[in-house]
Regions:
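Long, distal/terminal scaffolding or interaction modules
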Residues: 1-297
């Protein structure tokens, strides 16, 4: 849990107003913006662009690009609807808490952003960001966190597809991820105590580690380098581990394992071990655990 502390209150307060003009509060500094609405027929862009050290509390956003190039900001108890497109780009040192955020392309090329207790529906959320922490939140997104670095996620309910592709240095714990094509081309990712549901999990990843996870879906974990599974279960998983360098300790049954490239896969039972149409050396070993004797067949 992040337990975000927002910035200290400021003497300058802007309260209970509506803004609709372009750059309405441009370069605002050391201020609190409270119970304000950013909407109207003027349809102005970039209402809070280039702000510094501000708190935005209980505000409504329905205009494009509201918080670009913001530095040291808190966004608390606020809402952004679908008209608030690309709302937070090139921002740094931000804290987002208890918000309902709907704008497409939320967070792009941002640095040091904390998100907690939020509900987010934003296709293309979090692209090319660095130092992102997310906790106790719900996110629906396609291409979640594409090509981002240094990410910590805890207690996330996530739904979408093509998630975490090309990410590096990611840690996820106690989360539910319902997403196809997750972790493709990722590097140095650890997922703990989580449910990971969706087809084609983790292809072409490097240094992907799953610990105490429930893995669900067809053809997972193929073409991986240095893949590790510790105390995981696998459901509806067929054609797993094709051409992967893998060391895995799996509890329960796997439908089928195909052409593991190297390493050892320990499993309670497997429906089929497939070794055919091999395009490269497939020297991985599959061992069946016989728990009552603690030996392997």
């Amino acid at each position: 849990m992040l337990a975000i502390n927002i910035n200290q209150p400021h003497a300058t307060k802007i309260e209970n107003q509506q803004f609709e003009e372009e750059r309405a509060l441009y370069n605002l500094k050391e201020s609190d913006v409270i119970n304000c609405a950013f909407a109207g027929p003027a349809d102005g862009e970039s209402v809070l662009k280039e702000v510094r050290d501000i708190n935005v509390i209980n505000c409504q956003f329905s205009l494009r690009y509201p918080l670009w190039h913001a530095v040291k900001f808190s966004l608390v108890g606020s809402e952004m609807d679908g008209n608030a497109r690309a709302p937070i780009w090139y921002a740094q040192d931000g804290k987002i808490r208890e918000c309902q955020l709907e704008g497409i392309k939320l967070l792009r090329e941002c640095q040091n952003i904390e998100v907690e207790d939020c509900t987010i529906h934003s296709p293309e959320f979090g692209w090319k960001c660095n130092d992102i922490a997310i906790a106790n939140s719900e996110i629906e997104s396609e291409y979640l966190l594409l090509d981002s670095r240094n990410i910590t996620i805890d207690h996330l309910q996530m739904q979408g597809k093509y998630s975490f592709q090309y990410v590096e240095q990611l840690h996820i714990s106690d989360s539910v991820l319902d997403t196809k094509d997750a972790f493709w081309h990722s590097k140095n990712v650890t997922v703990e105590n989580s449910i990971v549901k969706g087809e084609y999990l983790g292809w072409f990843s490097e240094n992907l580690t799953l610990i105490d996870c429930q893995i669900i879906g067809t053809q997972p974990l193929c073409y991986c380098k240095n893949l590790t599974l510790i105390n995981c279960t696998m459901e509806d998983t067929d054609l797993a581990f094709e051409y992967s360098d893998v060391n895995a300790d799996i509890k329960g049954h796997v439908i089928s394992i195909k052409n593991p490239k190297s390493g050892t896969i320990i499993v309670d039972s497997v429906g089929e071990i497939i070794q055919d149409n091999v395009l490269t050396d497939s020297l991985g070993k599959v061992k069946i655990r016989r728990e009552q004797w603690n030996i392997f067949d």
